[in-house]
């Protein structure tokens, strides 16, 4: 069995308008400012998995700073896991310093995600 264990996917709105998030999310801009940095959705991911013989992918979003954005993205991950049940394994993502981190973890676990996908410290000085 082949499992891709670190896969970010993004909702259509984020893929089509990544620049909208650059002002408030500097870590996102740092990683995705270039148009060469591909943003894929769940449909594109599963198609690529089929083409490459990947059985399962562990998916998550991005550790957004803003609560509204990470909730929207985690909702997308939960929806993708339901849509491609058995193929996609979902983890939640958020800024670990956000005051809603604990409640978001609980919400995502209750929604079928299996844990936390990434604690990103891109700009914190922690390495």
Question: What is the predicted function of each stretch?
Answer:
Residues 1-60, 68, 109:
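An N-terminally biased module of ancient metal coordination in phosphate/nucleic-acid-related enzymes
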Residues 55-56, 64-127:
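Active-site gating/metal-coordination segments in enzymes
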